[in-house]
Amino acid sequence: MSLPSTFDLTSEDAQLLLAARVHLGAKNVQVHQEPYVYKARPDGVNVINVGKTWEKIVLAARIIAAIPNPEDVVAISSRTYGQRAVLKYAAHTGATPIAGRFTPGSFTNYITRSFKEPRLVIVTDPRSDAQAIKESSYVNIPVIALTDLDSPSEYVDVAIPCNNRGKHSIGLIWYLLAREVLRLRGALPDRTQPWAIMPDLYFYRNPEEIEQQTAEEEAVASGEQTEEAVDATEEQTEAAEWAEEGQAQEEEWN
């Protein structure tokens, strides 16, 4: 697929894709994923062509931007590493997120509270989100999916080839997709300027690491408060000593 020069993959984005290990695919390859294989490493891992990945990101973004109401796009991730990315994507683009377990019947059973009638569905993993893809096929909803080389592609209309098992890879794909959608909608008109949002915001964070970081910040803050208290005490002590010396000198003069 040839893209206009405006949509060319920049060196910065290529470095991001490689740093996030988006190019590391599975050892097994589905027949529909063979065009996305760049080469096979000696250890058996297949390398994904990141140029193809970028082309599919642009294609998916153009499809998403063509939908007038952003809420008609549903972003789904039952995989833990993709839930934070889905929520951030929805917050930035206005899509409807489903992070966690997908309730069966959400697209087919209008009696359920979670019933939705989206115009487009985006999933993180065709295997873990198989129920959402199956229901989308029943009601003719197009599906965009982040697919690894061994992922099933039945009922997937647009497959974005990537490493959909790594937390950095998943977060970066959702980040680039959100940025491209905002650019096509005109929210980010200047393509030469970087987006103010960093990719790290889309990465999965372990709750234990967050608690540890919070505890360290509190410890540092308490340490600073202790140092300030010590400094204040020393200043008060020095002031008291000066006052005593001055009083003693006055008594000697008298």
Curated annotation (Swiss-Prot):
The keyword Cytoplasm applies. Keywords: Acetylation, Cytoplasm, Ribonucleoprotein, Ribosomal protein. One of its GO terms (biological process) is translation. InterPro entries: Ribosomal_uS2 (IPR001865), Ribosomal_uS2_CS (IPR018130), Ribosomal_uS2_euk (IPR027498), Ribosomal_uS2_euk/arc (IPR005707), Ribosomal_uS2_flav_dom_sf (IPR023591). It is found in: Cytoplasm. HAMAP family: Ribosomal_S2_euk. This is Small ribosomal subunit protein uS2. The lineage of its organism: Eukaryota, Fungi, Dikarya, Ascomycota, Saccharomycotina.
